[in-house]
């Protein structure tokens, strides 16, 4: 019988500070692996780049956005089968670790609701002024994109300086995702994790989004 090592949440936090993150090969994997890509995807949010069509939708406030109300449901939504793939890198160990990180105050979920139903969202990890985006999901068109807009607005409001998307993915091109090498990423990471920042979760979502319009520097 192969031995399964127990990984503590604190190990995951330490990995993030080094620019390393965990993933499982599949939902049925018993363990996880750690990755440090040579090329990293970083999302700009000072100011954020939001497509014009999505910006118009965002102003209509189509969904109710909440934070950390049902973290397990968000990670389960991210792990659910999708039209383009039936497998996921979120296995039981990943789920357990990130729920533990949530309970410790490091992992956060942004949740989109409509008529009381969770219809999309995302989750990630905050350390200092860095936010490490992990995964997102939608059960209704644009739900995860709206959640991402709210995340970027709050990161900007709270003095964050880095939004790590890990990889450069096609669906994030519309948000101006930037590709940087690991050396440049490490410099940004070191600055970010030593930056004093806060998600300011006591500040209403309406005020956070309104700050985008006041800033008048949102690009599209």
Where are these predicted regions, by residue range?
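N-acyltransferase acceptor-side catalytic subdomain
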Residues: 1-220
């Amino acid at each position: 019988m192969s031995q399964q090592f127990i990984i503590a949440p604190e190990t995951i936090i330490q990995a993030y500070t080094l620019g390393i993150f965990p993933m499982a090969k599949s939902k049925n994997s018993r363990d996880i692996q750690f990755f440090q890509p040579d090329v990293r995807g970083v999302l700009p949010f000072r100011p954020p780049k939001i497509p014009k069509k999505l910006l118009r939708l965002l102003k209509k406030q189509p969904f109710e956005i909440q934070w950390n109300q049902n973290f397990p449901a968000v990670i389960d939504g991210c792990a659910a089968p999708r039209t383009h793939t039936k497998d996921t890198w979120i296995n039981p160990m990943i789920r357990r670790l990130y729920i533990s990180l949530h309970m410790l105050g490091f992992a956060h979920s942004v949740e989109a609701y409509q008529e009381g139903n969770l219809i999309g969202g995302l989750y990630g990890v905050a350390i200092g002024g860095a936010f490490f985006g992990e995964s997102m999901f939608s059960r209704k068109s644009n739900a995860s994109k709206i959640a991402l807009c709210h995340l970027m607005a709050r990161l900007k409001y709270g003095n964050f300086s880095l939004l790590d998307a890990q990889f450069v993915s096609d669906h994030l091109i519309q948000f101006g995702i930037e590709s940087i090498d690991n050396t440049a990423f490490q410099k940004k990471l070191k600055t970010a994790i030593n930056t004093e920042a806060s998600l300011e979760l006591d500040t209403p979502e309406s005020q956070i989004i309104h700050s985008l319009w006041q800033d008048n520097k949102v690009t599209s």
